[in-house]
Swiss-Prot record:
GO molecular function: protein-cysteine S-palmitoyltransferase activity
Function as written in the Swiss-Prot or TrEMBL entry: Palmitoyltransferase specific for casein kinase 1.
Protein name: Palmitoyltransferase AKR1
InterPro entries the UniProt entry points to: Ankyrin_rpt, Ankyrin_rpt-contain_sf, Palmitoyltrfase_DHHC
Top-level enzyme category: transferase
Composition bias type Low complexity, residue spans: 629-645
Catalytic activity of the protein: L-cysteinyl-[protein] + hexadecanoyl-CoA = S-hexadecanoyl-L-cysteinyl-[protein] + CoA
Stretches that traverse the bilayer: 312-332, 337-357, 369-389, 403-423, 499-519, 554-574
Segments for region (Disordered): 38-58, 628-665
Subcellular location: Early endosome membrane; Golgi apparatus membrane
Written domain comment of the UniProt record: The DHHC domain is required for palmitoyltransferase activity.
One GO location term (cellular component): Golgi membrane
Keyword Endoplasmic reticulum in annotation: no
C-alpha cells in the first residue's frame, strides 16, 4: 500500500512501500523549487536530491535573493536558503522553527532530506526540535537524512543529540534506513554509534537481512564484521541467507556462508536457502557463492587433500621436477618429437596445480594468489645454478670475469628475490579497537573526508596517500605499485627497491649465462656433422644451435628458457626505472591513462584532489560557522567506493560525461568492423600470456597513455630526476608513506626540507607536519 507525504505548498515528496515485499519506504518522486521560485516537476532527481551542476558540488547553491515573505520557512528549508531563514529569524526572533506544514513536517526535515548542512546547522542552533517526529511515516529528520545516505547531515544531527534508536511507523530505526540507502560510508559511521545492530523492524527484518535482500555485498560484509547475527530469523522464519538467495547475489551469499550462516535453516514453509534459490531460478549464483566460500552445493566443506602447508610445499617442488623433465625430454627425443612432449608436460603441470592441488579453491585468482609463479622462478634459478656448477665453473677457461659477474648476479638475484617475497611491502595496520576506529571516523567526518579515498572499509584503517587496497593480499599497501605473482607478494613502499634489484640482477645474470653458454659450447662441443642423407637431416637451423643441441640439449633448453624471461624482464626494468625517475608507481601511471590523474577517481591530479578535499571540508561545514554545503560534496548517495576504489566525484572542469555527450562518433559506441574483430581476437589470444609474463599492466586499459601524460604538473611528488632516483635508491627513512595522509600546503619539496631539517637539528620531530611556504 503506497503511503504519501503531500503538502499544500509546492514541495512534494512521495514515498511508497516495497519489498520484502510490503514495507520498505523508498523515494519515488520529488518536486522541488527551481532557482526562479517556481515548481519544476521535470527536475532530475536522484534519491530525493536535485542533481546539481558539478561546479556546485561541495558548496551552497547560489540562488537569486528572495524576500522572506515570498516563501514560508518550510520552502526555504527545502531550498536550503540559509540567508533567507536567518533574515526571517532576525526579523521575528520568536519564529517557531518546529512548526508543521500540511504534511506534519518541520523545516528541519526538509533541510535534512535535501542535505543542506548550513540550513540544518542554523535551525538546530536556533532551537529546532532535533527529534521532531513528522510526516505520515512518523519519522525524525535523522531518519529522513539516513534514508538518502546523507552522511554529513547524519553526523551533524547525531553530534547534536539526535536519537538513532527511534522507530518510525514501519518499525525502521536509523540503521535500517541507512542500510536501505545502500551507502556504505554512512552505514560504517552508524555502526560505530550506540545502535543495536540486530534490531528488528515490524516484520522482524534486521539490517543484515535488508542488505542481503538488496544484494549490497559491501554492506553485508560490513555488518557481519561488526557482529550482525547471520542466523537470526524474521517473522516468517527467514534468515539473511534466505534473503540473499532471493536476490541471487553470489558475493553476499559467500560472505554469509563464510561467516557461518546455516545452510539447513528452514523458514516457516520448510524451505532452505537452497530450496528458495532453486525455486526462484537462482541456483547458479547460489552455487557459485557457496563454492567461493569453500562449500559444495550439497553443503560439504571443500578442503585440499594435502592441507595448506603441504599444498604450498607440493607447488614449490612440482616446477623443479617438471622443468627438469621438460629440458631432459630434448636429450632423450628428437626435437620434432620432444616439442609436443614438452608442451604436454607443461600443460600437465598446469593441470596438476590448478585442478588438483588448488582444485578445492574456486576463486578466479587462486593461481595468482598461490606460490605457483614464484615456484617457477625458484625452479629456474635452481637449474641455472646447477648448469653453472656442473658445466661453466671448470670448463670455461678465459672467462673468469664473466663467471665472477655471474656469481655476483646469481647471488644478488636469489637474495633480492627472497627479500622481495618475505618483506612486508608496507601493509597499512588494520584498525583493531572500536574506540580507535571510531576516533578516526569522527576525525574524517569532521573534516568532510570520510570516503573511499581516505578510509578502507575492509582494513578499517585510514588510507595514506599513494596507497591502495590489494584485492589479492586483502590489505592496504603504502605507496602501492602492483601485485606481483612472481614474488608472491605486493610491491610497495618497503620492498619496491628489492623487487627492482631482483629484476636487474635477473637480467644481468641471464645475459652472462647466455654468454657463458656460448663460450662453453664453442670450447667443448665437438664439430657438428650433419647426416649424409639430406632427407634424414634432423637439424635445419643454424649450425651453432645444431651443435649445441647435439652436444648438450639440456643446457640449450635452459639457455632458451632464460632468454624467454629476458624479454618481459627487460620491459619491466625499463618501465620501472622510468617510473622511479618520475617518482611514480605502476598504479599511478595506470590511473593517469584511465582517469587523467594519479590517485584514482577524484580529481585531475593528486594536487588537484587535495585542493578538492580542502574545499569539500570547508563546504560541509567542517570549520566553525553557520554556512555549509550539501552532502553532494562527498558524492551522490550510494556512490561511496569499495576496498580497491575511490569516491566517484564529478571532474573539476564541471563536465560530466554521459550518453548526451557528442565528442565525435568514437565517443558514442564501438565498431564491429574487421579491425575491431581482429583486435578483440588478438587480445583474447595474447591476454593470458601477457598476464603470466606481467606485461598486462602495460597493455590493458590506457597505461601507455598514462606514460605520455606523466608530466610534472600532474605529479606533486616529482622532485626532479636526480633527486627522485636518490630518494629511491638511497632512502634515509625520512618519509613514512604509511602515515602521510595529505600533501603539505607548501608542496612535497617543502615537506622533504622540513624532514631533513628536523633530522639534523637535535630534538627535531622527524615526522610529518603541515609546512607553510614561509618556513622554507
Amino acid at each position: 500500500m503506497d503511503q504519501e507525504m503531500t503538502t499544500v505548498a509546492s514541495p512534494d515528496i512521495r514515498v511508497k512501500a516495497t519489498s520484502p515485499d510490503s514495507n520498505r519506504a523508498v523515494l519515488e518522486q520529488s518536486i522541488v523549487l527551481s532557482d526562479s521560485g517556481r515548481l519544476d516537476e521535470g527536475s532530475s532527481i536522484r534519491g530525493g536530491e536535485l542533481e546539481r551542476d558539478s561546479q556546485e558540488v561541495g558548496r551552497e547553491t547560489v540562488r537569486e535573493p528572495l524576500m522572506c515573505h515570498d516563501l514560508d520557512i518550510h520552502a526555504l528549508a527545502q531550498r536550503g536558503d540559509t540567508a533567507a531563514i536567518a533574515a526571517m529569524l532576525q526579523e521575528n526572533p520568536s519564529l517557531n522553527l518546529s512548526a508543521r506544514d500540511a504534511q506534519d513536517v518541520t523545516p528541519l526535515h526538509w533541510a535534512a532530506i535535501n542535505a543542506h548542512m548550513g540550513t540544518c546547522r542554523l535551525l538546530i542552533d536556533s532551537g529546532a526540535d532535533i527529534d521532531a517526529i513528522g510526516g505520515e511515516l512518523k519519522a525524525t529528520p535523522l531518519q529522513w537524512a539516513a534514508r538518502n545516505g546523507h552522511l554529513y547531515v547524519v553526523h551533524l544531527l547525531i553530534s547534536r543529540g539526535a536519537d538513532p534508536n527511534i522507530h518510525d511507523s514501519q518499525g525502521f530505526n536509523t540503521l535500517h534506513l541507512i542500510t536501505h540507502s545502500s551507502a556504505v560510508m554512512p552505514l560504517l559511521y552508524m555502526l560505530h554509534q550506540p545502535v543495536a545492530i540486530d534490531e528488528k523492524d515490524t516484520d522482524g527484518h534486521t539490517a543484515l537481512m535488508w542488505a542481503a535482500y538488496q544484494g549490497d555485498a559491501l554492506s553485508v560484509d560490513l555488518l557481519i564484521r561488526h557482529g550482525a547475527s547471520v542466523n537470526s530469523t524474521d517473522n516468517a522464519g527467514m534468515t539473511p541467507l534466505h534473503w540473499a538467495a532471493v536476490k541471487g547475489n553470489k558475493v553476499s551469499i559467500m560472505h554469509l556462508v563464510e561467516a557461518g550462516a546455516s545452510l539447513d535453516a528452514k523458514e516457516e514453509a520448510g524451505k532452505t536457502p537452497r530450496d528458495m534459490a532453486e525455486e526462484l531460478r537462482g541456483l547458479v549464483p547460489f552455487q557459485k557463492g557457496l563454492e567461493e566460500a569453500g562449500w559444495s552445493i550439497d553443503g560439504v566443506k571443500m578442503e585440499g587433500k594435502l592441507g595448506p602447508r603441504n599444498t604450498i610445499l607440493a607447488i614449490f617442488l612440482l616446477p623443479i621436477a617438471v622443468l627438469w623433465l621438460i629440458f631432459s625430454t630434448f636429450k632423450w627425443l628428437p626435437v620434432y618429437v620432444g616439442v609436443p612432449f614438452a608442451i604436454a608436460e607443461f600443460m600437465g603441470m598446469q593441470y596438476t596445480v590448478v585442478l588438483v592441488l588448488l582444485g578445492h579453491i574456486k576463486a578466479q585468482d587462486k593461481v595468482s594468489t598461490s606460490n605457483y609463479f614464484a615456484s617457477i622462478i625458484t625452479a629456474s634459478l635452481i637449474w641455472v645454478g646447477y648448469c653453472w656448477i656442473s658445466r661453466f665453473a671448470v670448463n670455461t677457461p678465459g672467462y673468469a670475469f664473466s663467471n665472477l659477474g655471474f656469481i655476483i648476479m646469481f647471488v644478488g638475484c636469489c637474495w633480492t628475490f627472497w627479500t622481495a617475497i618475505v618483506t612486508d611491502p608496507g601493509f597499512v595496520p588494520k584498525g583493531q579497537q572500536d574506540a580507535e576506529i571510531k576516533e578516526v571516523l569522527e576525525d574524517l567526518v569532521d573534516a568532510g573526508r570520510l570516503n573511499g579515498t581516505n578510509f578502507c572499509i575492509v582494513c578499517m584503517a585510514r588510507k595514506p596517500l599513494r596507497s591502495k587496497h590489494c584485492r589479492t593480499c586483502n590489505r592496504c599497501v603504502a605507496r602501492f605499485d602492483h601485485h606481483c605473482p612472481w614474488i608472491w607478494n605486493c610491491v610497495g613502499a618497503k620492498n619496491h627497491r628489492s623487487f627492482l634489484l631482483f629484476v636487474l640482477f635477473l637480467i644481468g645474470g641471464i645475459i652472462l649465462f647466455i654468454r657463458l653458454t656460448i663460450a662453453y659450447i664453442q670450447q667443448n662441443a665437438p664439430e657438428y656433422i650433419p647426416t649424409p642423407n639430406p632427407g634424414l637431416t634432423t637439424c635445419d637451423i643454424s649450425t651453432t644451435l645444431c651443435q649445441a643441441g647435439d652436444f648438450d640439449p639440456f643446457l640449450l633448453c635452459m639457455a632458451l628458457w632464460s632468454t624467454l624471461q629476458l624479454t618481459w624482464t627487460s620491459v619491466l626494468a625499463i618501465s620501472h626505472l622510468w617510473q622511479v625517475s618520475r617518482q611514480m608507481t605502476t598504479f599511478e601511471v595506470s590511473n593517469l591513462g584511465r582517469y587523467g590523474f594519479m590517485g584514482g577517481r577524484g580529481g585531475q591530479s593528486l594536487r588537484d584532489q587535495s585542493g578538492a578535499m580542502l574545499k569539500q571540508a570547508a563546504a560541509v561545514g567542517a570549520g566553525i560557522g553557520m554556512s555549509g554545503a550539501g552532502e553532494e560534496a562527498a558524492g551522490p548517495p550510494g556512490a561511496e567506493a569499495g576496498p580497491e576504489g575511490n569516491a566517484l566525484l564529478p571532474p573539476p572542469g564541471g563536465h560530466v560525461h554521459g550518453p548526451q555527450c557528442r565528442h565525435g562518433d568514437h565517443a558514442r559506441g564501438h565498431s564491429h568492423g574487421v579491425l575491431h574483430i581482429c583486435g578483440a581476437l588478438w587480445k583474447t589470444l595474447t591476454g593470458p600470456l601477457m598476464t603470466i609474463l606481467g606485461l598486462d599492466r602495460f597493455t590493458k586499459g590506457k597505461a601507455l597513455g598514462g606514460m605520455k601524460r606523466a608530466g610534472r604538473d600532474q605529479n606533486p611528488f616529482d622532485m626532479g630526476m636526480v633527486k627522485n632516483c636518490i630518494d629511491f635508491w638511497l632512502p634515509d627513512n625520512d618519509v613514512d608513506y604509511m602515515t602521510v595522509y595529505e600533501i603539505p600546503p607548501g608542496g612535497w619539496r617543502a615537506y622533504r626540507r622540513k624532514l631533513a631539517m628536523d633530522k639534523r637539528v637535535p630534538g627535531g620531530k622527524g615526522r610529518y607536519e603541515v609546512v607553510s611556504e614561509q618556513e622554507v
